[in-house]
Structures are given as structure tokens and as C-alpha cells.
Amino acid sequence: MKIQDKQTSPKFTLDDNGYLVTTAKLARIGAMQYLGEEIGKESGKIYDVHVDPDDLFNDATIKSFENMPVTIEHPTEMYVDANNWQELAVGHISNIRKDESGEFLIGDVVVNSPKAIKIIQDGKIEVSCGYDADLVDADGKIKKANIKGNHLAIVNEGRCGDKCKLGDGKP
């Protein structure tokens, strides 16, 4: 039995099946900026939307991201489901958890698609979660609540910047 990983970089491994395996910071607590039209507010205005630890790290949120598909960019349909996953999914995420710093939601990422692996190896490594959430006005702040995961998109520029990316986070 051959048990040897092939390193593509210090942060990415190709397993014996040719799948890219890594860990990623998926999401973070704190404020992120949204245009008003993205969140049902005044168009053209920028709003800070807060994610509190109790909302990001609760059991329901963590479980909702377990085994969700990985995509290249967010789908135009906005969601991945049983009707479109075959065209959109290039891998999956699992072992979703809070990182040691208490700031990030992290997970293990497996990418199966050779085309997607090449895109990652060429440097596209930021990620953005696709999800549903309620926006709640609380103490003069807009915050996300009831976060329910749908997919993880590999993007050029994610909303939480280069803090959320593939190959970042302890395995």
C-alpha cells in the first residue's frame, strides 16, 4: 500500500487520487462592508455588517457548512443545490470548526477538479462563503444571525480579504 502525499506547495497537498487537500479560513467575526443594494438598504451607501462569535460559532452554523460544495466563484443562481451541484461543485469542505484564535471559522477542503486545482495552483486562493442569514438591527448595528451555509466559493477577492483563504489555518 502506497501512502505518500505529493506536496504542491507547503500549504497544499495532492493525495494519491490527485485531489488537492488543504485547510482554509472560511469566515471571520467582525465587521464587513456591503453595498446597500446587497442587503436591502439605501443603494450606493456602504454599510458595516457585523458577525458576532455567538452567531458564527454556534452549533447550527457550524453544522450547516459541513460537507458543503466548493465552487469556482459564486454561482449566478446564488445557491448550489441538488439540481445544479454537478455543474458547479469542484470539491467539498468538512471538519468545520472554530480556530484557536477564536476569530475564524476554518475547515478542511478537498478539491477534485483538475481545472480547479490548476486555478488554485496559479494563485486564486481567497474564499467567500455562500449562505443564508438574517440581518438584524441590534444596538444601532446591523448584524448577521441564523447563518446557514450553502457553499464555499474560490474567488479573486473575498469580502474578508486575504484573511480568508485556502492553505491558511491549522490542519
Question: Which positions does each model-derived feature cover?
Answer:
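Residue microenvironments linked to proteolytic maturation
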Residues: G91-P171
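Short conserved beta-strand and strand-loop elements enriched in small hydrophobics
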Residues: Y47-V49, N58, E66-N83, V127
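Short amphipathic beta-strand and strand-loop transition segments with alternating hydrophobic
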Residues: T8-F12, N83-E100
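Acidic low-complexity intrinsically disordered segments
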Residues: P53, D59-S64, W85-E87, I125, ...
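Short acidic, glycine-rich loop/turn motifs
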Residues: T13-L14, I72-T76, D137
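Low-complexity, polar-biased intrinsically disordered regions enriched in Pro/Ser/Thr/Gly
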Residues: Y34-V49, M78-W85, I96-D99, D137-K141
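Glycine-centered flexibility motif
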Residues: G30-M32, N67, L88-G91, H151
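Polar/acidic, low-complexity leader/linker segments enriched in S/T/G and N/D
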Residues: M1-K63
